[in-house]
């Protein structure tokens, strides 16, 4: 079957990952000891997308946990599903990366990377037909960003034809955890543009907003934030794990969402988001789901899709619903808001329907959109980067680990190129065909 190898790196990646495994285990009826207690054969039918079956009928996540310090992993191990993971798959150092991308990518991380790759190989060899890798990490710290991107490039070398999907937490505009975030994030994006197939962009501020505004939580914790992310993550691969009328997988997603190879940074959303108390009063309809799914407040990254245009989008529905209704709603959205979709890609929304809804819901939908508005986020990071880099602030921490200023300059210009590519396609119309061809001839 189509297996996925899950890798989580750094504090953020491990916390999101731990939450994700709680959600997935719940969907498949796996308890914290790895035993199956479900009520439907469908839960077991394709459980091997995410789990290996061990002796005595135990199910073990195909997950690799890596970090440069033991702290977060100890808390994962002590957490509710900590005993589920394979002990050999915890790979950690003792030194920490200290929020320094260079430590994660070139020094500390480089020493640990081979032991991580051994575990990755071992998991990949146990697969019948490996679909790809999914990685959860943040771009603001040192391990998830530096070592995460190092791992991505190494895995890319060894498995060039497998899909590499990342769930990357980007530094938020207002909530900053570390001063050097813009450096770490820019250096990471520089890597992700080249080596990843699909990047789902998440940021904490947008998640906080969803918790405050929509879920009416007064004091959201990281646990609440990570729960939102894992709901969307589970939706992306739901079609691989449960039967459906219209299937999708990581590769189909990539083919339908990426019109140009570098533009693979997606916004994700999830609907229905209702506060815990008011859940039982709402029967959701497909039009309501569609409405909420395209709502800017629903996006898990702080970029407003109304400021750009969708190149492509994908709606992954879950639950029993009529295919006809889904198709009608998708057409409806495109016709009514046609100015928000580029006209030179007709029918640019892909939909898929999976029969099994998430726990506690009749219907749900995960939204993945490739919008040119995501450039707002890169612009924001680039401005902060330039402000510091112009004065060479904090640079000695990076050059001290053997990095060169050149690498910063390259990363900066790569990110600026990315922004202008998004802008170019946002402004493009169907009539300008001739001009594009001439431009490409000159390059």
UniProtKB/Swiss-Prot annotation:
It comes from the Eukaryota. One of its GO terms (biological process) is microtubule-based process. SUPFAM superfamilies: Tubulin C-terminal domain-like (SSF55307), Tubulin nucleotide-binding domain-like (SSF52490). Signal peptide: none annotated. Coiled coil: none annotated. Mg(2+) binds at residue 69. The keyword Ion transport does not apply. Keywords: Cytoplasm, Cytoskeleton, GTP-binding, Magnesium, Metal-binding, Microtubule, Nucleotide-binding. Its main location: cytoplasm. It is found in: Cytoplasm, Cytoskeleton. Dimer of alpha and beta chains. A typical microtubule is a hollow water-filled tube with an outer diameter of 25 nm and an inner diameter of 15 nM. Alpha-beta heterodimers associate head-to-tail to form protofilaments running lengthwise along the microtubule wall with the beta-tubulin subunit facing the microtubule plus end conferring a structural polarity. Microtubules usually have 13 protofilaments but different protofilament numbers can be found in some organisms and specialized cells. Belongs to the tubulin family. This is Tubulin beta chain. It comes from Tetrahymena pyriformis.
